[in-house]
Each structure stands twice: as C-alpha cells, then as structure tokens.
Amino acid sequence: MLAHLRPALVLLLVLTGLTGFAYPLLSTAIAQAAFPHQAHGSLVRKDGRVVGSTLLGQPFDDPRYFWGRPSATSPVPYAGQASAGSNLGPTNPALAEAVKARVDALRAADPEGAAPVPVDLVTASGSGLDPHISPAGAEHQVRRVARARGLSEAEVRRFVARHTEGRLLGLLGEPHVNVLLLNLALDGAR
C-alpha cells in the first residue's frame, strides 16, 4: 500500500515546495528588483511620513480637498481587509437611498453647483477602495475646492489637468485622477 501512496506523497511535497515556497519567493524577488516602489505598495510619503498609497482611496471630507469615490467597506471606510463591493443590486431601495444621500451631501457642499453629479462620486467601485475619480468627478468639485482654498477655479483646473492620467497605452481604461496625489499637490501649492 505504501508503494501506491509514495508517488502521490512525493508529488505533494514537491508541488508544495514549488508553489508554496519557491514560486512566491522568486516572484517577490523579481518584483523587489524590477519594481521596488510598487512591490512595497506604491506608498506616498510627505515629510518622511507615509501618508497613503496611490492604490487605495482615502476618506476626504474637508471642503479644501477633492473627495474620492464612496467606500463600500464598513464599518471603517477604505479598510483594505474589508475590500468588497456593496453587493446592492440596481433595484435595491438601499442603493437608491445611499446614492440620494451622497448626491444631497455633494449638493450641500456646493449649493451653487447645478451640474449633474457624476456617477463615480456617488457609487462605490467594485473593491470599495478605488483611489481615482473621473475628470468629470474632479471638475464637479473645482468650484468648492477653489473657494475653500482661496484659489481661482482656473488654478485648480490646472492642477486637475496636470494630475489627469490618460488611458493605458492610449486605449485601455478611462482617463482618471488620483485623488490623494491631487490633494497633496494642492497642499504643496500654498
């Protein structure tokens, strides 16, 4: 009987060693050598302190800052360990209520704004942790941020334009703005 089990056990041990140890170690070593910044989480530092990551959204609610997409993680917003969508379907009344509350909050923050609220500012992404908003989402907030910072709308629009990333290879994805990097650039302006 042991003769029949031996090949299976040897294969189990070999594959465990290869896929459980050798492959992860090799992948990590290659990532550390080729892409050290990304391998460490694409961390953003300010004055020597880590203030965030370009890969994860953060809650911003101060009028001086651009606000990102809503987080679907709860009870703590933007908690990586709770990453998931809200799983609320389009016909679920709770989704409609949440979107309406978010629209109302954005309108209250900029009562003079009459433009429709871009959908990415009121709906969570699939992961609930998206660090980006659309250029339309940024444009929707320009007046509020400019007023709160004492800048002209044209100045704030220039910041948005400088921080708008295009499509990958010119055709994949949509143009987007990293909210953390934009807010840090605005902080550095004055």
Curated annotation (Swiss-Prot):
Keywords: ATP-binding, Cell inner membrane, Cell membrane, Ion transport, Membrane, Nucleotide-binding, Potassium, Potassium transport, Transmembrane, Transmembrane helix, Transport. It is found in: Cell inner membrane. GO terms for cellular component: plasma membrane. It holds the Pfam family KdpC. It comes from the Bacteria. Part of the high-affinity ATP-driven potassium transport (or Kdp) system, which catalyzes the hydrolysis of ATP coupled with the electrogenic transport of potassium into the cytoplasm. This subunit acts as a catalytic chaperone that increases the ATP-binding affinity of the ATP-hydrolyzing subunit KdpB by the formation of a transient KdpB/KdpC/ATP ternary complex. PANTHER family: POTASSIUM-TRANSPORTING ATPASE C CHAIN (PTHR30042), POTASSIUM-TRANSPORTING ATPASE KDPC SUBUNIT (PTHR30042:SF2). NCBIfam families: kdpC, PRK00315.1. The system is composed of three essential subunits: KdpA, KdpB and KdpC. This is Potassium-transporting ATPase KdpC subunit. The lineage of its organism: Bacteria, Pseudomonadati, Myxococcota, Polyangia, Polyangiales.
